[in-house]
Amino acid sequence: MIEALKRTFRSLCGAALAAALFGLAATVPAPAADKVSVVAAENIYGDIAAQIGGAHVAVTSLISNPSQDPHLFEASPSAVRAIADARIVVLNGADYDPWIEKLIKSAPNPQRAVVSAAAVMGRKPGDNPHLWYDPATLPRVAEAIASVLTAADSAHAADYAANLNALTGALKRIDVRVAELRARYKGVPVTASEPVFGLMAQAIGLAMRNERFQLAMMNDTEPTAHDLAEIERDLKEKRVKALIYNAQVSELM
């Protein structure tokens, strides 16, 4: 069962991220003058914008390396310029990428539209910020992106609508897979180093343990002695069937 869960985790990551996992660019190219310029904080949202916008958009994703810690990201001068000039900026929000919110505020642009996944999903700082693992997030963010693209470039509204329809149709395959996994794994006890996969685990119906420990790790605070002892006991006594580990963290304990 553990190996099956590991394979499931990898396949869901691949499905959700689609074609978005590429190297981190050192500089940001200038968009073509006849295209709608879109800047995404993370490439998963940049990929959504590119699929909806097609040939009519120039998309720049500032974080494209899955091992990059968004909390430690420092924007290059070209990235700062790209944000200042962008017609559309897409971000995660919920304190996952606060650096881009600061850059947006420092460069006011009345023609710029901002799409925040957290705002779309009604999430706030303190909530689990890994919103793309919620199967409901990407379709709703896609709708929001299509809406602002249509407002910025109404001449290609039909193309944006068609691309949105195709994308949301493709994303329904994830819903089907999640339903299959829920039927098989609902109630299976698991734990994690951080709540990165928490929203997907919730959708699948996994019984997530040690959530206070995970929050402490995510917030870079010391877990309590009780919470530390509890996760150690769960692992040593094999009370959980899988450990979901955040590769961005060098140590679990």
Each model region followed by its residue ranges:
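Extracytoplasmic metal-acquisition and chelation regions
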Residues: I2, P31-M253
